[in-house]
C-alpha cells in the first residue's frame, strides 16, 4: 500500500509539473505573438503597384506588376487598399493570342489577369505627375476613392515599380522620367504629412539600386533587382506569345511569396536571399540603414499581407441566447432556407429539336367578302381594258 501511494503521489507531481511547463510554454508563445503585434506598430497595409512601360515587347513588365498584385490580394490586402497602375493593356492587345489573359509562367500555366483585376490608373493616366500625386495625397477633390492612397501614420506601405531605367531614373512610357531625387523628396513629403508608418520600396529595373541612393526619410526599407552599372534581365521566353513573360528578379520573388501564408513567420532577411547572382545574373541590392527595426524582426506579412487585429481579453462572453432570440433566429433561418431554394425554369425543347421541328399546318378558312370583292374588281377592269377578243393572246 505504501509503495502504491508513493507511486500515485509521484505520478501526480509529475503530471502537475508537465501541465505547468506546458502552460508556461503556451503563455510565452501568446506573449510573443502579442509583443510582435504591438512592436510592428501599424494598423493597416497599403500597396502601390506601378508598371511604367507600354508596347507589346514590354509584356513582362505588366506581368511583373500583376503577379505582385495577385500575391498581395491572396495574402489579404483588399482592392480598396491597392492602387494598381498599368501603362498598357496587354490583355486586350491585338497581338495577344489569348485575349483577356496575361501569363506569368511558360506554357500559359498561370493567368495573372483573372476576372477580378481592378486597374486604377491605365494607359495615358500612368504619368510621373499622377504617381507623385498619389504618394503625396495632392489629388483633385473629384478624384474617386479607388484612385487615392488613403494611408495614415499607422500604415505600412508597399511600393513596387517595374520598367526601363538607368542610373538615377526610371522611364514612364518612353516619354518622361522620374529621378531618384524626385522619388526621395516625395517620400519625405509622405513622412512629413504622416502618410506612412513604415515603407517598403521594391524596384525591378536596370541599375535599380540607384533609385534608393538618395532616400533620406526614416522607416524606409528598399530592395532593387540590380546594382549601378548592371542590367536587370528578363526570364521565360514563350514562343506562342513571342516575348519574355517576366523579369528574373520578380519571378523568384513571386516564387518565394507563393510559399507564404497569412500566419507565416518568414522575415525580411529571407526575402533578401531569394534571388542570388547565380539565378538573377544581376546583383540584387537592399538598403536598411533608414529602417528602425531589425529586418529579422520584420515579417513578410507586415507589408505583403493584411493586418489581423488580435485583442486579448479576460472577460467571460456568454454564448447562450434567450429563448425569444432563439425562436426569432429559427424563423429567420426558415425564411432564408425558403429564399435559397433553387428557381425552376419551364421545360424547353433542345435546340436541335427546335431546328428540325416541322412547321404546323394552318387550318383553311374561306376568304372574306373584302377579298372576293377585290378580285371581282380586278376581273372587271381587265375585261373592260382588253375585252374577250384579246383573251387568246393572253392564254
From Swiss-Prot:
Give the pathway listed in the UniProt entry for this protein: Glycolipid biosynthesis; glycosylphosphatidylinositol-anchor biosynthesis
Question: What happens when you mutate residue 232 to A?
Answer: No effect on function in GPI-anchor attachment to protein
List localization entries: Endoplasmic reticulum membrane
Ranges for the region named Autoinhibitory loop are: 231-236
GO CC terms of this entry? endoplasmic reticulum membrane; GPI-anchor transamidase complex; membrane
Q: Which family does it belong to?
A: Belongs to the peptidase C13 family.
Q: What is this protein called?
A: GPI-anchor transamidase
Q: Which gene encodes it?
A: PIGK
Amino acid at each position: 500500500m505504501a509503495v502504491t501511494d508513493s507511486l500515485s503521489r509521484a505520478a501526480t507531481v509529475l503530471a502537475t509539473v508537465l501541465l505547468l511547463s506546458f502552460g508556461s510554454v503556451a503563455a510565452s508563445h501568446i506573449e510573443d505573438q502579442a509583443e510582435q503585434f504591438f512592436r510592428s506598430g501599424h494598423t493597416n497595409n497599403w500597396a502601390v503597384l506601378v508598371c511604367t512601360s507600354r508596347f507589346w515587347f514590354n509584356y513582362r513588365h505588366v506581368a511583373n506588376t500583376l503577379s505582385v498584385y495577385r500575391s498581395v490580394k491572396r495574402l489579404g490586402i483588399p482592392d480598396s487598399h491597392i492602387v494598381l497602375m498599368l501603362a498598357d493593356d496587354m490583355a486586350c492587345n491585338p497581338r495577344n493570342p489569348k485575349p483577356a489573359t496575361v501569363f506569368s509562367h511558360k506554357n500559359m500555366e498561370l493567368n495573372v489577369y483573372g476576372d477580378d483585376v481592378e486597374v486604377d490608373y491605365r494607359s495615358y493616366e500612368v504619368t510621373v505627375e499622377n504617381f507623385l500625386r498619389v504618394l503625396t495625397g495632392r489629388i483633385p477633390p473629384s478624384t474617386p476613392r479607388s484612385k487615392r492612397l488613403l494611408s495614415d501614420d499607422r500604415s505600412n506601405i508597399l511600393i513596387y515599380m517595374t520598367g526601363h531605367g538607368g542610373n538615377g531614373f526610371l522611364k514612364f512610357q518612353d516619354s518622361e522620367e522620374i529621378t531618384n531625387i524626385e522619388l526621395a523628396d516625395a517620400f519625405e513629403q509622405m513622412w512629413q504629412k504622416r502618410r506612412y508608418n513604415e515603407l517598403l520600396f521594391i524596384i525591378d529595373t536596370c541599375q535599380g539600386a540607384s533609385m534608393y541612393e538618395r532616400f533620406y526619410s526614416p522607416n524606409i526599407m528598399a530592395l532593387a533587382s540590380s546594382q549601378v552599372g548592371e542590367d536587370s534581365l528578363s526570364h521565360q521566353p514563350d514562343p506562342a506569345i513571342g516575348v519574355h513573360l517576366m523579369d528574373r528578379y520578380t519571378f523568384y520573388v513571386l516564387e518565394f511569396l507563393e510559399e507564404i501564408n497569412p500566419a507565416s513567420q518568414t522575415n525580411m532577411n529571407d526575402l533578401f536571399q531569394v534571388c542570388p547572382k547565380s539565378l538573377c545574373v544581376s546583383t540584387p541590392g537592399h538598403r536598411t540603414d533608414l529602417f528602425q527595426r531589425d529586418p529579422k524582426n520584420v515579417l513578410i506579412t507586415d507589408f505583403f499581407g493584411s493586418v489581423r487585429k488580435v485583442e486579448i481579453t479576460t472577460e467571460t462572453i456568454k454564448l447562450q441566447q434567450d429563448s425569444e432570440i432563439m425562436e426569432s433566429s429559427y424563423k429567420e433561418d426558415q425564411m432564408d432556407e425558403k429564399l435559397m431554394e433553387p428557381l425552376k425554369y419551364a421545360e424547353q425543347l433542345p435546340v436541335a429539336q427546335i431546328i428540325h421541328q416541322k412547321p404546323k399546318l394552318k387550318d383553311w378558312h374561306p376568304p372574306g367578302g373584302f377579298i372576293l370583292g377585290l378580285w371581282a374588281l380586278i376581273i372587271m377592269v381587265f375585261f373592260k381594258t382588253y375585252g374577250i377578243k384579246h383573251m387568246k393572246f393572253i392564254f
